[in-house]
Structure formats: C-alpha cells, structure tokens
UniProtKB/Swiss-Prot annotation:
Protein name: Transcription antitermination protein NusB
SUPFAM superfamilies: NusB-like (SSF48013)
Regions that span the bilayer: none
UniProt keyword Nucleotide-binding, yes or no: no
Organism lineage: Bacteria, Pseudomonadati, Pseudomonadota, Gammaproteobacteria, Pseudomonadales
Organism of this sequence: Pseudomonas fluorescens (strain Pf0-1)
Molecular function, one GO term: RNA binding
Amino acid sequence: MISDESDRFNPRDPKPADAGKPSKSAKRREARQLATQALYQWHMARQSLNEIEAQFRVDNDFTDVDGAYFREILHGVPQFKTEIDNALTPCLDLAIEELDPVELAVLRLSTWELLKRVDVPYRVVINEGIELAKVFGSTDGHKFVNGVLDKLAPRLREAEVKAFKR
C-alpha cells in the first residue's frame, strides 16, 4: 500500500487553537453524567440542591464540564418534577416509585430536556439518555430507557419527530 505524504504527522504543523479542548457536546455530556449522579443523590438522600451542587463542584474537576448546564439540569429537574413525572407516567409499565432510582434519574433528566430544552434535538436527548443508562444503569437499563424515551418523544415533540420521520 502506498502511503500519502499528506496523511503523515508533521510536528512542525501548527495545531488549531482549540486542539485538545473538548467540544460543546462533550462538555454537555460530562454535565449530564454529573447531573445524573447528583439527581440520584437528591432522590435518595433528599439533600438540598445547593449542598449537592457545592459538593459536586468540590469533588469533581469541572474543567471539561459545561458547569452552567449541570446547574440548569440539577435545579431544573426538581423544579419541574411534577410536570416531568406526569409526562413520563403514560409511557411507563411501572409506577414511578417502582423504577430503579438510577434509571429514574436518567429518565427525569431526559424528560426535562425534551420539555424545557427544545434547542437540543430529540434524537440527541434519546441518545444521551441511552448512553447515561449504559454508564450508570443496570445491565439492560439502557433498553428500558430507550423504550420509554421512544414513546415519550413523539408526545412532547410531535412536530419535530414527524418532520424527522418524513
């Protein structure tokens, strides 16, 4: 196989100014991961959101995290918990109280994004929810989360889902 010279690494080539810096989507993914853990803690321990946020900011390196988005999720999900749970309930085969707490945290976060962050495409919300469930949930938790979000997205983002499926 003949190699193309242009594919070779040249240490003299200038690096782009943002080389090595995480993208906006990567920073948001990190924010979602930390927020999932923080929401789980809020659900289980019923600590104040400000205490949880302060603890997470001390215990975690926020260099590669969208800290504002983390805060928005952490405070937004509890603020709209009733609306979120009411939206989720018709898409569940179990009562909310019977859900695994990790999967509940993921579903609440994803539902909040579908309801309150219409700038985030529904397909991104579903994918991120699945990835969070793979990282933090039970063995097949991501399949459950996927099924619920697939039912929920058309209910909350009907026009967007229809436009994509054309």
